[in-house]
Amino acid sequence: MKAYTAAGLDEVGRGALFGPVFAGAVILDNQAEDQLIDAGLKDSKKLSALKRSNLVPLIKKISHCWAIGQSSAREIDLLGIRNATEKAMIRAVHRLEKQPDVLLIDGCLNLRLWHGEQKTVIKGEDLYPSIAAASVLAKVARDDLIKRMAEKYPQYGLEKHVGYGTALHRAAISKFGKTKLHRKTFLSKIQ
């Protein structure tokens, strides 16, 4: 009898002004779920950056499989954030070593590009460890990329706000202009 597999799926960076949107996909068995919960896994927004970073190696080690997908700022501008987010999620799912029978998606974004079973779950990170794990992987991967970009674009203070529309970031955009990694469609009211 074939084992039924579900992949948790979540996105990070959807509302940022800078950089790509990331998505994580994770398949966990019951034992891995319990182990991650015992290690403190929960909604990535409720974890410190250090705790998230400490969970990443464990998630990668004990998950059945995991993957990250992303869509660039250019894709976001060309496709819109909804379609770009969906592409990032589909990319993550397609990169999984094993294709799941069902997707458990945090939020309410049905994937039009996925022809299999899917379930959207509001506050899914609180209900499904696989979604929480996907969120942690995506958040840490995106934050790491943005911190590297902060070295290239130090005038924007990216290490402080990871690309979100804080007053500091908006002021820097007004002063220095946009980079090729800024989402032009998100900046219409700033410049």
UniProtKB/Swiss-Prot annotation:
Manganese or magnesium. Binds 1 divalent metal ion per monomer in the absence of substrate. May bind a second metal ion after substrate binding. The keyword NAD does not apply. Its EC number is 3.1.26.4. PROSITE patterns: RNASE_H_2. It holds the Pfam family RNase_HII. Its main location: cytoplasm. GO terms for biological process: DNA replication, removal of RNA primer; mismatch repair. Keywords: Cytoplasm, Endonuclease, Hydrolase, Manganese, Metal-binding, Nuclease. A divalent metal cation binds at D10, E11, D106. It catalyses: Endonucleolytic cleavage to 5'-phosphomonoester. One of its GO terms (cellular component) is ribonuclease H2 complex. Residues 4-191 form the RNase H type-2 domain. One of its GO terms (molecular function) is RNA binding. HAMAP family: RNase_HII_B. Endonuclease that specifically degrades the RNA of RNA-DNA hybrids. Belongs to the RNase HII family. PANTHER family: RIBONUCLEASE H2 SUBUNIT A, RIBONUCLEASE HII. This is Ribonuclease HII. It comes from Prochlorococcus marinus (strain SARG / CCMP1375 / SS120). The gene is rnhB.
